[in-house]
Every structure is written in structure tokens, then in C-alpha cells.
Curated annotation (Swiss-Prot):
The name this protein goes by in its record: Heptaprenylglyceryl phosphate synthase
Gene Ontology MF annotations: heptaprenylglyceryl phosphate synthase activity; magnesium ion binding
Catalysed conversion reaction: sn-glycerol 1-phosphate + all-trans-heptaprenyl diphosphate = 3-heptaprenyl-sn-glycero-1-phosphate + diphosphate
Ligand binding (Mg(2+)): D13, T39
Organism: Lysinibacillus sphaericus (strain C3-41)
SUPFAM superfamilies membership: FMN-linked oxidoreductases (SSF51395)
Essential cofactor(s): Mg(2+)
Length: 229
């Protein structure tokens, strides 16, 4: 399945433990893809471990790159975030330049997906690490979405609330502005009801932390998203 058609994504953190039994339930849940990525302590060993374990199942697997040292072949897609609301050029284009300089000769460009991130939780680790300006109005956020689609021509715009449940009005407003760029939503989903609500607006709903806190609740989000038109 092409990433443009994904509705539901389970995000696994390579720095967190997950049992084989729980991983099997995640991989056979009906989710569209397993997205591997994290902020802290992302290592090549962790990325390889999840790749090998998930490859036993039919579900596609993608890697969201946060550090050059943890890049490995074998994933179906490689998601490359550029943090549009960061004040640090490192997270907008410098790391990307370094990665292309090192791996450009062997990159399969059709496997790379550039995503414009807008981080909206001021207290999350990724906001602190990237120096993101999170005190944004809806107009600010919509402007970033327009910039992602019309200026940078990015295929994905990612609203990242990272640990807190976001504002559906913001997600709806952004979706109404995007015509070609796909809207990913991630952050704070702990129930099927929340997943269903965000699926009304976002093209793709990403479910992460709840996997490690309440697996049953996480699994229930798949049907909730898939049944939302």
C-alpha cells in the first residue's frame, strides 16, 4: 500500500521494549504500517531489532529518521522530517544535507518521504530538542500547512502534539487548506473515540505511546480509524 493511502499507523519507539506477543498483535491488527521512530536513545541496534522482528509479518515498515547513526537498509519507506516551526536550521535542512552528503550515492529516492512537521506541545521532548516555537495561533499553523504544500511541495504535513491530545479545530482547519499534501496527526490518542475524532479530519492517524500503556486500547484504534470516512 502506498503511504498516501495510509489511514492508521502504529508508531514504535526503538528505545522502548515490546514483547514478541504484543508485537505480533500490533503487526496483525490491520494497521496500514509500522512506523519506527523516537526522540531519545535511538540506536542502530534498536532500529535493526524492530526491523528484523516486524519483517516476520506482512505489514509494511517505515523508518522515521532522527539520527544519521541509526539509518539502515531494509525498510519500505524512510520518512525525513523537517521541523517547519523550529528556529534551528539544524532541524529544517542541516541534518538533511549531512545525510544526503553521506548516503546520497546509495539513496533510493522513491523510498524517501519528506514530511513537514509542526510541533504543538511545548512540554514535549521533541519541542525542546528542536527549538520549536509552539505558541502558535490557528492562522500560524494554517500558514505552515500552506507553506508545506505550496512552497516546499511536501507530500506530508504532520501535526505533532506528542503526548497530549490535540485540538480538533486546528486539525480541521489545516485539513480544509490542504489539497494535495496529506495530513498526518499524532499525539495523545488513548482511546478509540479520540482516534475516530481525529480520523474525521486527518488523512492518517498515528498512534504511539498508548501501545506501551494499554495495548487493548491501542488495538481498538485501528477499527475506529478504518471505519471513519
Amino acid at each position: 500500500m502506498d503511504y498516501l493511502e495510509w489511514r492508521h499507523v502504529f508508531r514504535l519507539d526503538p528505545a522502548k521494549d515490546i514483547s514478541d506477543e504484543d508485537l505480533e498483535k500490533i503487526c496483525e491488527s490491520g494497521t496500514d504500517v509500522i512506523l519506527v521512530g523516537g526522540t531519545d536513545n535511538v540506536t542502530l541496534d534498536g532500529v535493526l531489532d524492530l526491523l528484523v522482528r516486524v519483517r516476520r509479518f506482512e505489514v509494511p515498515i517505515a523508518l522515521e529518521i532522527s539520527t544519521i547513526d541509526a539509518i539502515t537498509p531494509g525498510y519500505d519507506y524512510y520518512f525525513i522530517p523537517t521541523v517547519l516551526n523550529s528556529d534551528d536550521p539544524k532541524w529544517i535542512k542541516n541534518l538533511h544535507h549531512a545525510a544526503i552528503k553521506e548516503f546520497g550515492d546509495i539513496m533510493v529516492w522513491d523510498e524517501l518521504v519528506a514530511e513537514g512537521y509542526c510541533i504543538l506541545n511545548p512540554d514535549c521532548k521533541v519541542a525542546h530538542v528542536t527549538g520549536a516555537t509552539t505558541d502558535l495561533s490557528i492562522d500560524d499553523i494554517v500558514a505552515y500547512a500552506r507553506m508545506a504544500e505550496n512552497f516546499f511541495k511536501l507530500p506530508v504535513f504532520y501535526l505533532e502534539y506528542s503526548g497530549i491530545y490535540g485540538n480538533p479545530e486546528v486539525v480541521s482547519a489545516v485539513k480544509n487548506e490542504l489539497k494535495h499534501t496529506k495530513l498526518f496527526y499524532g499525539g495523545g490518542i488513548t482511546s478509540a473515540k479520540q482516534a475516530e475524532e481525529m480520523a474525521q479530519y486527518a488523512d492518517t492517524v498515528v498512534v504511539g505511546n498508548i501501545i506501551y500503556e494499554d495495548l487493548k486500547a491501542a488495538l481498538a484504534t485501528v477499527k475506529a480509524v478504518k471505519n471513519t470516512l
